[in-house]
Amino acid sequence: MKKIPVFFINGMLDSGKTTFIIDTLENDIKERKAKTLLLVCEEGEVEYTNELLERTNTYMHVFESIEDFDYKFIDKLIKNEKPDRVVIEMNGMWDLSKLQFPRVMEIVQVITFIDGSTFNIYFNNMRQKFNDIIKKSHIVCFTKLENPEPLAPYQTALKLINNNAQFMLMDENLRAQDAFEEPLPYDVEADIIKIEERDYGTFYIDTFDHKERYDGKTVEYDIMVVLSDKLPPNTFIAGRFIMNCCADDIQLFGFLANNTLNKPLKDRQWIHMVANISYEWSEEYNEEELVLDPISIELIDEPKEKVLDLTK
């Protein structure tokens, strides 16, 4: 069965979804005469004109509610219109887990638009909704911001939600730039990279984004030991529990560590560790993973806040 590519454009009302789709249709028609099936789940101030739809070879259907978004009906639309691609302008308030799609559809890209001018208010009050949206996104575009500075405090929280996504800042002319440019809060050029408690999330994310900064380096920080029968012999996870959204969303973020010092460690024990960093191929994750080889381990008291709370 030949799959039809689906481009999923998500986000809240008036965040720039329609403007982006119109620009995409306009640019694509210059290169090819592909037919587009446009499924609109939310109508804002910007509208699709009949002239645009006809000129760009686009058939549009508007869904008034999530109950109307029926996969059998969509399947009929596909059979009748025979599109080369499907573009979905999603309603950001809909529960995506309740949506079903015909088997012929294949979602190839999810782009989420967020109004940067109100992001801090909505993110602090609707964090679970943003979590759900961002987790499924390939690209996250912030609009209505002149510079990325207001986003800097949220960099770690957003990347912990989905570190595989590209976070972009898009201006009114649809020109894009990286959303995050803030300097690291620690010195990666130091002989020993010292990580403070508040900076652990930033460190964790950056080791994936910039492996070249850390490979062969030495790190020092306070961390929790996690033991498991599922780990290779004489290894442990050096990690921390982080709350990025709410109490139900607490997750462990850590790295595999070799117990090269043969320390008698206990599960959930806290240690002060200095360790060498290397990257080794992981068959489980099919990519290089950071591995720690301790130089020194000292037992310490557990911190007052065992869970690193990024919601504050």
Where does each model-flagged region fall?
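Nucleotide-sugar donor phosphate/pyrophosphate-binding loop at the beta->alpha transition
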Residues: 122-128
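OB-fold and OB-like single-stranded nucleic-acid-recognition modules
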Residues: 12, 19, 34, 107-108, ...
